[in-house]
């Protein structure tokens, strides 16, 4: 039998995800590799999800736990909109997720989350959540997963407090690209999105390839 601590270690050691707070929105990025121990289990893993018109989230950890949580939160966001006529705010969504995670703290959902959103009143918001519901509201950037130490190195060097989404996209892609070169549990491409006053925009593989070419030209 696998103990809870051993299970936690097995499922929390892969992935790289990053989030950047920009002056006009939020940028989120993840790699696409899913691992089980030393096995690359999936080369097209989805780790970036649109939750609502103005909210998106990245996942790291146990895929099943994260997907179950995403289905629940997406449904709650739809119900909220039907009842009130308004979109759930990023803070409200984060608080709801935190309550669900904390309610399961004795049998925790083995996932670490980054939530980015745009509040039409209060602007861009970026949060990170731990497996038992702890919330951090980020004022600049954050990263999770086994490749996060490398990603943080790039983010620390490249991030500026007045960064725009256009620049933030390049910084996020560069951070992911660097992490994938150094971390065996991250790789197989990048998923990328931004959230601003116009909503969630998820980029195509072709658009991401264009960002990679811009970065490589500067090296």
Swiss-Prot record:
Its EC number is 3.4.25.1. It is found in: Cytoplasm. InterPro entries: Ntn_hydrolases_N, Pept_T1A_Psome_bsu_arc, Pept_T1A_subB, Proteasome_bsu_CS, Proteasome_sua/b, Proteasome_suB-type. The active site is at residue 15. The keyword Protease applies. PROSITE patterns: PROTEASOME_BETA_1, PROTEASOME_BETA_2. Its main location: cytoplasm. Residues 1-14 form a propeptide. One of its GO terms (biological process) is proteasomal protein catabolic process. Disulfide bonds: none annotated. Keywords: Autocatalytic cleavage, Cytoplasm, Hydrolase, Protease, Proteasome, Threonine protease, Zymogen. It catalyses: Cleavage of peptide bonds with very broad specificity. GO terms for molecular function: threonine-type endopeptidase activity. GO terms for cellular component: cytoplasm; proteasome core complex, beta-subunit complex. It comes from the Archaea. It holds the Pfam family Proteasome. Belongs to the peptidase T1B family. The 20S proteasome core is composed of 14 alpha and 14 beta subunits that assemble into four stacked heptameric rings, resulting in a barrel-shaped structure. The two inner rings, each composed of seven catalytic beta subunits, are sandwiched by two outer rings, each composed of seven alpha subunits. The catalytic chamber with the active sites is on the inside of the barrel. Has a gated structure, the ends of the cylinder being occluded by the N-termini of the alpha-subunits. Is capped at one or both ends by the proteasome regulatory ATPase, PAN. Component of the proteasome core, a large protease complex with broad specificity involved in protein degradation. This is Proteasome subunit beta. The gene is psmB.
């Amino acid at each position: 039998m696998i103990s809870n601590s051993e299970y936690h270690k097995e499922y929390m050691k892969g992935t790289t995800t990053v989030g950047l707070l920009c002056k006009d929105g939020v940028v989120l990025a993840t790699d696409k590799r899913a691992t089980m121990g030393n096995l690359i289990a999936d080369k097209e893993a989805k780790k970036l999800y649109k939750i609502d018109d103005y909210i998106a989230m990245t996942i790291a950890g146990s895929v099943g736990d994260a997907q179950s949580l995403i289905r629940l939160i997406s449904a709650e966001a739809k119900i909220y909109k039907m009842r009130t006529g308004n979109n759930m705010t990023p803070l409200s969504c984060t608080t709801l997720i935190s309550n669900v995670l904390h309610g399961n703290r004795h049998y925790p959902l083995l996932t670490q989350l980054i939530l980015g959103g745009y509040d039409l009143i209060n602007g861009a918001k970026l949060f990170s959540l731990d497996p038992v519901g702890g919330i951090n509201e980020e004022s600049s950037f954050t990263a999770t997963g086994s490749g996060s130490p490398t990603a943080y190195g790039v983010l620390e060097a490249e991030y500026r407090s007045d960064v725009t989404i256009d620049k933030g996209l390049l910084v996020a892609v560069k951070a992911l690209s660097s992490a994938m070169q150094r971390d065996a549990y991250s790789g197989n491409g990048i998923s990328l999105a931004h959230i601003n006053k116009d909503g969630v925009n998820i980029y195509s593989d072709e658009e991401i390839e264009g960002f990679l070419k811009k970065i490589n030209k500067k090296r």
